[in-house]
Structures are given as structure tokens and as C-alpha cells.
Amino acid sequence: MSQTLTANQPAPGPLRALPRYPSLYQVNTRVWLTELSRTLGKRATLDDIPNAELDRWQTLGFDFIWLLSVWQTGPAAQRISRENPHWRSEFQATLLDLQEDDIPGSGFAITGYTVHKNLGGDAALARLRQRLAQRDLRLMLDFVPNHMAPDHPWVQSHADYFVAGTEEDLQRAPQNYTRVALPDGERIVAYGRDPYFSGWPDTLQLNYANPAAQAALIGELTRIATQCDGLRCDMAMLVLPEVFQRTWGLRSQPFWPQATAAIRAQFPDFCLLAEAYWDLEWTLQQQGFDYAYDKRLYDRLHAQAARPIREHLSAGLEFQDHLARFLENHDEPRAATTFSPEVHPAAAIITFLAPGLRFFHQGQLEGKRKRISPHLGRGPDEPIDTRIQAFYLRLLELLQQPLVRDGRWQLLPCLSAWEGNWTSDCFVAFAWDDPRGERLVVVVNYAPHASQCNVRLPWDLSAAKHWRFTDWLGDDLYDRAADSLSEHGWYVDLAPWQCGAYLLTQLD
């Protein structure tokens, strides 16, 4: 591998065009490099990520690799992370043998949008990006619009870029404000926060009511965009004018429309993913984001009731196509902990065979159970759950098929199997088809009991007398008469949490 590439080296291209429904894999960069360091017997950088691992990502069918926490952080936030007793108890629960060096500080308390020197700097990232691009893998990085680390240079050079407070604010809400020493004296500055929680004490809040701050951030965004193919924007809804005013009582001009337009003016195919909550996903999509987090589907899957899931999936594709579907990420508990072994495959099939961006997290495919805080640089050793691993490998094979990457998706009605049978309400079913004539039916009994229904299929099946349903993810196989399918639908009787993804083929 060449070591001569410099920072901002353009990725070799053009990359293969993205499908309508791509897949993303989130990597906890610092934690993974710590593991590599133990293997190599030296501090690993981005240059040490083996090509074999990049090949594996390509083989698994991912389109985006999101490297979490690559930017430079500093000693101020690290000290706060190490001294905060609440956070420290969380770290101790994750790592029973916790050491000080395991706490580099939050990767979201950024002192500068340059690649951390411990990871090899900007040049190492450029070399990794080239290696990814050789495999048609796109690189996604973080952008944190809401706040900066306390020792970011802007705090000293442009204090007006941050939300200022008063002595009264500090006395009233000491959890949301702090004193900062500046060249012209001490100033009270707000911690970064959202309106529903106390401030993050390792950050300072950016002031979107200041047009100069917005302009500076757009400058950072367009510069970062030269180093990657996409950005995941942390807590993107916090800087919407209505949210910013509710949090801080300050009026601001819209940021995202001008920011996303500035990026697209230079990089038309650049991908923007918004971390979003509070039903603001559509708002952010309309302001230039390709995708927004779909926390609502996650929450409804967690609640384990099928009807609210169907209602959510009944939204128009102009909305659904631009949602990022996930079962876990660095903020949420591990899926193997949240969902029991029986429920996990059912939740995964609904999540990842729905339209949108398929968002996977490092460790999820192996059934890891311990969430790793973004303040930590090391994770616990955990065994692989071979059953979950086998399931995900089979699911990822299906997700590489053109039928579900570029095909047409539609929700299917599930009718009562007989009068008085209410268990049809426990199903989630949908279909995929494409111009080549391929058809797939996904059926999930999302309930802790057996359920029956007639799934109404959306196709004219008169071309054959009988059709075969073959489960891509299991061993089930059913032959059904076309007349019965057209008149009554496909009768299914599934055990608790049973699910399948069935390819339809003509028999005669």
C-alpha cells in the first residue's frame, strides 16, 4: 500500500452508482484500532486497517462505511470524561478492568476537524479512503453541528460563536452553564445540550443566532466534504430555528438549507445523514438531507405491537425512502440485549427489508451485548453468538440482491383467516418486485403467540396454476394454487415471532 498520498487526496472514481436502497456499516474507529494495536504490538493507525477487512465489508454488501470519532479531541474534554462520576460508573460497568487510558474522552467533543494524530492524521484517512473506493465503498464521517469542545480554538478566538450566559443563568441552571477564561476576562458560556436534558459538560454550545458562526460552520462543512463521501450529522434537529429558540430563547436563520446547498454545489452526490428525533425527520429531509434516523420504527419494534409498525410503514415512499433503519447504534443498547433471541430476527427482517438506508453497527452481526460509550477507547471482550451471526450473514446475502436494492416495495394487507380470528392484526407483511419479474413476500408474526391470516398478494398470478414460496432465510417451502391465492390470499399460520422472506416462482 502506498504511503505517499496526502490529505484531501481525491478518491479514485467514479464509484459504482448507489442503489436506491443502500447499506451502511458503522465502525467504532478508536475501539477497533485499540484491538488492532493489541494484535500488532504497536499503536495502530488508519493505515493498519487490513485490506482483508475492507474486502469483507465489500463482500457483505455495504455501500457506506461510517468511521465514528476520527476527529481531533483535546485534554479538556478528556479530563471531564475521566472525572464525571456518573459517566465513570457507566464506563466501569462496561469495562470491569477500566484504566485511565481507556477514556480518551467523547469523540463528539471536537477541538478541530482534522483527523486525530493518534489515528494517523488527514493523510492516513486519505489513504484509507482510496482503499475503500477501490472496493466501491464510500466513506462517511461525523459532523457535530451543535457544540464544540471547551478547548476548541474558536472559544478563544471567536467567543461570540458560542451561546453566552449570565450570572443569573449560572445560578439558576449550573448544569447548563460554566465559566470560561478568555483573553479579555472570564465569560459565562452554555454547555451544549438539547431542550430535554442537562448540558453536556464536555462541550460548549454554538450560537446559531450569530450569522458569522453559521458561515464559519458552513466553511468547516465544505472543507470536511473534500475528505469523505458523506457525513452523519449529530443531533441535526437541534439547530433547526424552532428547536434552537425553544432551547435557548434565541432567534436564528435556517442553517441546513444553505449548508446542504453549499456542499451539493461542490459535491452533487455527497450523502448527508441526519440523526433526528421528535418527528422532525421530514423537516430535515426537506432541508437537504438524504436520510434521517428512523427512531420511531425502532421504538415501535421495541414495544412489540404489530399495528403501530404497519401504520408507520404505510407512509409514502417519498418519506420512507429517506429514512435510516436501524436496530442499534452507538447511542442505543445492543440489539441482542434489547430484543430476545426469538424477537431479534423478526425485528431485523422488518427493519432491514423495509425501504430506506439499511444501517448496521459494528458488533451487531456477531450478537455483541455490551454498548460501548463514545467516551471509551476500548471495548470488552465478548463471545460471538453464532446463531445471530448466521442469521445476519444470510440476511445480508438477501440484501445484496437487486430485487431489494432497486426493486419496488409495498405494504400488504393481512386479512382475517376466519371470522372472529383477530390474530391477523399481529402480522407485518410486505412485498418486493422488479421489472425482471422477481417477487418476494416478507411475512412476520410480530407477537408472542401463534397467529393466522390471509396475505393479499398484489400481483396477477394467472401465468401459472401453482406457485412455490421458498424462504430465503430458512428452510420453509410452500406450494399454493394460483386460484386460491387470487381468491383468498396466501394463508399463513406462524408460530410466535416466526418470520420469513419468500421468493415466488412458477411451478406449472
What kind of region is each of these model predictions?
Residues 2-508:
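Active-site and adjacent substrate-binding regions of carbohydrate-active enzymes
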